[in-house]
From Swiss-Prot:
Feedback inhibited by histidine. It comes from Gemmatimonas aurantiaca (strain DSM 14586 / JCM 11422 / NBRC 100505 / T-27). One of its GO terms (cellular component) is cytoplasm. Its EC number is 2.4.2.17. CDD domains: PBP2_HisGL4. Catalyzes the condensation of ATP and 5-phosphoribose 1-diphosphate to form N'-(5'-phosphoribosyl)-ATP (PR-ATP). Has a crucial role in the pathway because the rate of histidine biosynthesis seems to be controlled primarily by regulation of HisG enzymatic activity. This is ATP phosphoribosyltransferase. HAMAP family: HisG_Long (MF_00079).
């Protein structure tokens, strides 16, 4: 049985549990404070801090894990991402005070060295500025890096942001994006896919289950009755995965039923186009899982 390390609290934990539940891998634990749980009876889950998951996976305490890519990068461990889970999206950015006159890394390089940079991500920050050729002194903090320039303990910050609103509220301006992050399913480089056949199959089944839910979230299943003579035009409107499925309707020679998978982003336009072609009885449903 594979052991999967999952975040033990916060939004990342909630979104992870939601994804696993939707994939049929219900998290079954003995209580809210339980350290382990069963995942649909197929896998064992252990609950740890998101920032510790890269270490647990790299050291073999867990076969796989779910955590933010920012934390994986900060750990410096050799880990492989098998799936971007599509939530927990954010950016790690360099930000300076609005009144500092800093608009680019070139502006930072012209400042009297060394610049002081406050961050929760000292390893990523050092690597970034070394590659940029900008000398800095990294000031590690455990949180609230955005107030460091106002307290005089740093000139700029490297901090996470989703919308940039927290930075703006604190009078900071984004200068450069260091890293884009989201939640990933990770393993060690020599992970389950390099193990025995049964463990490889277990892990492949896990990836397939999670990916099927992620893929389905942006799609809808559309069904409609359309005049037979406009099928060519309907095929142009409903490309689907491999084109629409066309089904004869009993006792109705003029109309056929078409079924197709359609992007949720374009569903309203698709419905309008079908109606213009004489489509009727249009039904749209959500898709729980999609395996191409």
């Amino acid at each position: 049985m594979l052991r999967i390390a999952l975040p033990n609290k916060g939004r990342l934990s909630e979104d992870t549990r939601g994804l696993f539940n939707d994939a049929g891998l219900e998290v079954r634990s003995s209580g809210e404070r339980a350290l382990t749980a069963s995942l649909g009876g197929e896998f064992e889950a252990i609950f740890v801090r998101a920032q510790d998951i890269p270490e647990f996976v790299a050291d073999g305490a867990a076969d796989a894990g779910v955590t933010g890519w920012d934390l994986v990068s900060e750990s410096g461990r050799e880990l492989t991402s098998h799936l971007d889970l599509g939530f927990g999206r954010c950016r790690l950015v360099v930000a300076a005070r609005e009144d500092a006159g800093v608009r680019s890394l070139e502006d930072l390089a012209r400042q009297a060295p060394p610049m002081r940079v406050a961050t929760v991500f000292p390893n990523i920050t050092r690597r970034f500025f070394e590659m940029a050729g900008v000398p800095v002194t990294v000031v590690p903090v455990s949180g609230a890096a955005e107030i460091a320039p106002h307290l005089g303990i740093a000139d700029v910050v490297v901090d996470l942001t989703s919308t940039g609103s927290t930075l703006r509220v604190n009078g900071l301006r984004e200068v450069e994006t260091v890293l884009r992050s989201s939640a990933h399913l990770i393993t060690a480089v020599a992970g389950p896919r390099n193990g025995d056949v049964s463990r490889k199959q277990e892990f492949d089944d896990l990836v397939t289950a999670l990916a099927s839910v992620i893929r389905a979230r942006g799609q809808r299943y559309l069904m409609a009755n359309v005049p037979r003579e406009v099928l060519d035009a309907v095929r142009a409107v409903l490309p689907g995965l491999n084109g629409p499925t066309v089904i004869d309707i009993a006792d109705h020679s003029r109309y056929v039923a078409v079924h197709a998978v359609v992007s949720a982003d374009t569903i309203y336009r698709t419905i309008s186009q079908l109606r213009a072609l004489g489509g009727e009885g249009i039904l749209v449903t959500r898709i729980e899982r999609l395996i191409p």
